[in-house]
């Protein structure tokens, strides 16, 4: 039989109460088969792995889907609602109801027991005649009879004194379930076998005061006269087997409905938690994607600025070489001109005066060119020093913070270009200010200088924006790690691959092993272990104890645990290498993750690789656990 009718369209939540009548009719007509031999099946979930249910299991399944399954459609809810109604109305008699074990040997006796009217909760009656040798106070003690009848497991015992016949009446009360009926039946059977049943008590044959009589309390006892009947009517009531069975069925139906509602509510809560978890996972994934994109853009921008910086430096060196060649050519021309002037002879005073003026002018020009050459040389030296200094700083910063220092490198190169242009402008001020070519060149260099300053400001703005984005991303990652540590602390154990580890706490296993090897008695080993572990945990947290040393040089210099420390050596000699390594590991963790506080801090940990877990590993692990949980629920 198919799970649903193809000819019927989907329905809304508000139509469930109306639509369920159609599948209910088909269930009544036998179109859907529910009961197969001694088991039950869901005709609307034929594709599921489980096909055989008990009555209670199928009723709980149908009620849970009808009332609370968020993953089911309204049509499926209506079908299961009809199935639950059908089972409650038509198949209630097929429910597994426990029947009492009636201790009799024949069918007629069993039917007679079932048809009897009993006092409920189940009670027995024991009559003990008091003889002259008996202690009346002992026989009236309830504790005495609780101990004497302990093999029948009574809940409590009531004793009554029947003055008319001088007997003690004992009324034990039993469990109201079928186990209580079994106990009171065993009591009655035991007394009947000894010939001390209710009939024997009524007949009172022979030496009847020498024996105790017992039987199960029934309607005759309840409706009789006397203190026994008064007590029975006070604490109990008359019930038949059919009444008790019906009440049991009703109670079980109520329990099943309650459990179905709880299952539905639990499923709804689980779906909400799963939705929240998916939201958090997607948020973390978006943060990581944004961070990766920022890193990619940052690297591209850094590479682009480096290429621009190299190109500009090469252009500066080419321009410097060209200016140097021009200066040398002019100096050579001046030398040739000076030699020519020296060779000329002044024919007249006017010519000599003109010649003197030309010489002075030549000397002034030569002096200016020499000063300009010296200034250019100084500027070149400064440029070379700036380049060398920039290279040295670049190598140092790459070992510390590669990405940010690459931006600073570009910024420094641009500043160097600006200084170079300022130097050139300063040199040109010493040249002939009336030269139109020099003026145009100075104007062009000023414009280029302004362009470089604007470009430097743009670089600084870009660098500031990238640094703000990076700080924001880092803050979000830190908050994400804190959130994961808080949420996962109660959800994972030390056996999980991804877990929350308290960095700086001692590993207890080496201490326990060492104490057990030294102490043969387990209790002594436990005490020794607790004292030793507590002592060294406090020692590790003590900031005054600094068992560290520095190894390596320069950038490779780092701080490690000094195994030659007196306390460390003493611990190794007394308790062995494994205990020493446990203390060493705790010190290294504190020195790495909390060097200032010297107290343990929680951290996401990859147990498989023995290192700090990345956010990507934690998210992948959570996703895998959610998928596993879905498969188990399915």
From Swiss-Prot:
- Kindly list the organism's lineage: Eukaryota, Viridiplantae, Streptophyta, Embryophyta, Tracheophyta
Entry keywords, A to Z: Coiled coil, RNA-mediated gene silencing
Q: Which GO BP terms apply?
A: gene silencing by siRNA-directed DNA methylation
Q: What does this protein do?
A: Acts in association with FDM3 and FDM4 for RNA-directed DNA methylation (RdDM).
Q: What is this protein called?
A: Factor of DNA methylation 5
Question: Which superkingdom does the taxonomy of this entry point to?
Answer: Eukaryota
- Coiled-coil spans in chain: 254-469
Pfam families to which the protein is assigned, alphabetical: XH (PF03469), XS (PF03468), zf-XS (PF03470)
């Amino acid at each position: 039989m198919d799970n649903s009718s193809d000819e019927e369209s989907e329905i809304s939540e508000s139509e469930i109460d109306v639509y369920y009548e159609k599948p209910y009719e088909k269930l009544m007509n036998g179109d859907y088969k529910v009961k197969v031999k001694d088991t039950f099946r869901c005709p609307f979930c034929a594709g599921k792995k489980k096909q055989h249910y008990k009555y209670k299991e199928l009723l709980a399944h149908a009620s849970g889907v009808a009332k609370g399954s968020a993953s089911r459609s309204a049509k499926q809810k209506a079908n299961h609602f009809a199935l639950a109604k059908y089972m409650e109305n038509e198949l209630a008699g097929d429910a597994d109801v426990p029947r009492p074990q009636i201790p009799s040997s024949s069918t007629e006796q069993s039917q007679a027991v079932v048809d009897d009217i009993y006092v409920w909760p189940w009670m027995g009656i024991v009559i003990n005649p008091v003889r002259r040798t008996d202690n009346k106070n002992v026989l009236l003690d309830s504790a005495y009879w609780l101990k004497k009848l302990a093999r029948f497991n009574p809940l409590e015992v009531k004793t009554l004194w029947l003055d008319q016949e001088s007997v003690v009446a004992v009324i034990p009360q039993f469990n109201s379930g079928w186990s209580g009926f079994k106990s009171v039946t065993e009591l009655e059977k035991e007394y009947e076998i000894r010939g001390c049943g209710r009939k024997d008590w009524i007949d009172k044959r022979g030496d009847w005061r020498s024996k105790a009589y017992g039987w199960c309390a029934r309607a005759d006892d309840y409706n009789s006269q006397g203190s026994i009947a008064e007590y029975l009517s006070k604490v109990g009531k008359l019930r038949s087997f059919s009444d008790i069975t019906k009440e049991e069925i009703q109670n079980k139906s109520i329990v099943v409905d309650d459990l179905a509602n709880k299952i539905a509510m639990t499923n709804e809560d689980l779906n909400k938690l799963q939705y929240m978890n998916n939201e958090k996972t997607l948020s973390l994934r978006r943060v990581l994607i944004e961070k990766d994109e920022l890193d990619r853009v940052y690297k591209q921008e850094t590479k682009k600025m480096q290429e621009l910086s190299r190109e500009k430096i090469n252009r500066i060196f080419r321009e410097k070489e060209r200016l140097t060649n021009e200066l040398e050519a002019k100096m050579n021309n001046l030398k040739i001109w000076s030699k020519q002037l020296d060779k000329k002879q002044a024919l007249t005073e006017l010519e000599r005066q003109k010649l003197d003026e030309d010489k002075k002018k030549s000397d002034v020009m030569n002096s200016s060119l020499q000063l300009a050459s010296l200034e250019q040389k100084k500027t070149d030296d400064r440029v070379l020093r700036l380049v060398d200094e920039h290279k040295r700083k670049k190598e140092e910063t790459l070992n510390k913070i590669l990405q940010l220092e690459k931006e600073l490198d570009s910024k420094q190169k641009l500043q160097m270009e600006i200084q170079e242009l300022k130097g050139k402008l300063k040199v040109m001020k010493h040249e002939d200010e009336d030269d139109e070519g020099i003026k145009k060149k100075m104007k062009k260099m000023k414009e280029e200088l302004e362009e470089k300053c604007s470009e430097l400001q743009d670089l600084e703005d870009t660098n500031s924006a990238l640094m703000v984005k990076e700080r924001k991303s880092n803050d979000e990652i830190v908050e994400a790690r804190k959130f994961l540590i808080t949420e996962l602390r109660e959800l994972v154990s030390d056996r999980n691959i991804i877990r929350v580890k308290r960095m700086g706490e001692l590993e207890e296993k080496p201490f326990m092993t060492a104490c057990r090897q030294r102490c043969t008695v387990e209790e002594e080993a436990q005490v020794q272990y607790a004292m030793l572990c507590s002592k060294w945990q406090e020692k590790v947290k003590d900031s005054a104890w600094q068992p560290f040393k520095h190894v390596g040089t320069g950038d490779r210099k780092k701080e490690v645990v000094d195994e030659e420390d007196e306390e460390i050596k003493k611990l190794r000699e007394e308790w062995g290498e494994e205990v020493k390594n446990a203390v060493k590991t705790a010190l290294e963790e504190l020195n790495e993750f909390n060097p200032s506080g010297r107290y343990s801090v929680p951290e996401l940990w990859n147990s498989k690789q023995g290192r700090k877990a990345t956010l990507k590993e934690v998210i992948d692990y959570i996703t895998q656990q959610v998928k596993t949980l879905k498969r188990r629920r399915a």
